[in-house]
Amino acid sequence: MSSQSLYKVSGNIAANALVNNDQYKKMYQESIVNPEGFWREHGKRIDWIKPYTKIKKTSFDDHNLSINWFYDGTLNASANCLDRHLAEHSDRVAIIWEGDNASEQRKITYGELHTQVCKFANALRSQGVRRGDIVTIYMPMVPEAAVAMLACARIGAVHSVVFGGFSPDSIASRVIDGKSKVVITADEGMRGGRAIPLKRNIDDALKHPDVTSVEKVIVLKRTGGKVDWIEGRDVWWHSLVETASEHCAVEEMGAEDPLFLLYTSGSTGNPKGVLHTTGGYMVYASMTHEYVFDYKPGEIYWCTADVGWITGHSYMVYGPLANGATVLIHEGIPNHPSPARLGEMIDRHKVNILYTAPTLIRALMAEGKQHFDKYDGSSLRIMGSVGEPINPEAWRWYHEVIGHEHCPIVDTWWQTETGGILITPLPGATDTKPGSATRPFFGVQPALVDNMGNILEGATEGNLVLLDSWPGQMRTVYGDHERFVLTYFKTFRGMYFTGDGARRDEDGYYWITGRVDDVINVSGHRLGTAEVESALVSHELVAEAAVVGYPHDIKGQGIYAYVTLTRGTEESEELRQELRQWVRKEIGALATPDLIQWATGLPKTRSGKIMRRFLRKIAANEVTNLGDASTLADPAVIETLIETRLNRNE
């Protein structure tokens, strides 16, 4: 193996880990050669009401697409996260919660969490929620967010969690698409010392003329902040659970019955509702959580992701709780009120496993390691990275400053659509290279293809595809199966197209190089460029807009917008700020453009297609080798854009 920046598995870790390198190779080989046998065995890791006999019926043929796992079995996700632990671990802490203000802390045992979920599940039923209904959840990072999700799962309702940073318009589009009858929110959330007006955002979202399905809004009293109230529609969480029974039988769900919807950005602009089902997802989330983090019973596990993202679903709620872990949930941000907060929390709660994002690591790195002078970190055993590729400098800083050079780092690659981790090191099995996601998890068959779909062998670079299904895979785009087929299975026939590019080195390790479609990755969160463009163009003074990502020291990718104003409109710094606020209001803070360049024209082909590759290079300040511009209707546009570019490194 090439020794360039190789971090070898220590003998001590390999000896005590769930799998070493030889075991990984043997298990991986079996999972590919005999997937039925492999998953027949590993599907038993969760509890089934009616055991499955049929394991896998899958096809990536775009004319005959089929994704079915454990498909004649029945189960309940909530029972797998709660009930099955009660006999032996009722008193084990399930959730440790620390508020935005560190003085606010709670501990909830598995027994207590079970009671809370049962009561709230009964409360949902009292508000008319039935099996198969879609419930929208827009909550702060409090234990009740997990309670709401598990209560939905308990009674067979499908939850659709919306990230608490999204705007009323973004909430409205998701409520409309899912036709939710019930919305669950809080008066406010707390983040970085600021109150987030969640209830007000819901009120504004529900004023949208196309929102016609919502009958009830359940409101958790988090801060006691003042909220508007609509009698007959709005109801307090606490008043509902006060009288609710502590007993709630679980709904028996088919393995392929929906568990949740989660909307993700697509390149067309309309967020797509990724639909995950129950059986395969629970098997895969719990198995990846155990093996990737080398989880041992009773360990304290902290995933810093928001519950509104897939990482919060799979690795803060379903995976860890199915495995009986103690999960730390933090309401705020781990670098507030100071960069020392992350280390303080690891020490305060004796965290064994940390799963966080490169954006946070880079932000802490920029503040300087002196903030970790008082940090002990001796409890920490495994560290993970998620959301985007981690640059080698940040990887090494994470390893040295947070991990004190003794914690293996699992740099995980996966997507909302995949349900769980697909490419990752395993702590006791994989020598790591900073910046590489390394090798596939069991049952995962990655390949690299050229633009014609030809499989590339050996050390090479190409489009990252997957050749066969895995249990955690999404099943469809809600209400638009054709879009599912078109997005993932039409580009390369017989393969799942990830939308990412990657290279494979001489050791077979994968290095994710980023999106190859029109989606940008801001602070580990996917945003469709079309969404941001649509928001800009909806402003009355904007005639046209093109949005691309560009390298950003902290966020990984920043948002760079080229804007053509309507005839006669004057360019000004005030208008630039107004447009930034406009996008923030339309989509959310995450989508705010970092740089807006005025453009008298955009590089277009004669058929009117915007040539984004030129815009990406100019935004990245790579202006010496732009490539052939002869297909452009007006090549002179390029020179003007280069002269007026904003991201110069002079």
From Swiss-Prot:
InterPro entries: Ac_CoA_lig (IPR011904), ACAS_N (IPR032387), AMP-bd_C (IPR025110), AMP-bd_C_sf (IPR045851), AMP-binding_CS (IPR020845), AMP-dep_synth/lig_dom (IPR000873), ANL_N_sf (IPR042099)
A biological process from GO: acetyl-CoA biosynthetic process from acetate
Coiled-coil residue windows: none
Enzymatic class: ligase
EC number: 6.2.1.1
Residues bound to ATP: 387-389, 411-416, 500, 515, 526
Molecular functions (GO terms): acetate-CoA ligase activity; AMP binding; ATP binding; metal ion binding
A Pfam family hit: AMP-binding_C
Keywords in alphabetical order: Acetylation, ATP-binding, Ligase, Magnesium, Metal-binding, Nucleotide-binding
Cofactors named for this entry: Mg(2+)
SUPFAM superfamilies: Acetyl-CoA synthetase-like (SSF56801)
Residues where N6-acetyllysine is found: 609
Keyword field contains Nucleotide-binding: yes
Superkingdom of origin organism: Bacteria
Residues the record lists as binding CoA: 191-194, 311, 335, 523, 584
One term under GO cellular component: cytosol
Similarity comment: family membership: Belongs to the ATP-dependent AMP-binding enzyme family.
PANTHER family named among the record's database cross-references: ACETYL-COENZYME A SYNTHETASE
Function: Catalyzes the conversion of acetate into acetyl-CoA (AcCoA), an essential intermediate at the junction of anabolic and catabolic pathways. AcsA undergoes a two-step reaction. In the first half reaction, AcsA combines acetate with ATP to form acetyl-adenylate (AcAMP) intermediate. In the second half reaction, it can then transfer the acetyl group from AcAMP to the sulfhydryl group of CoA, forming the product AcCoA.
Protein name, per record: Acetyl-coenzyme A synthetase
Gene name linked to the record: acsA
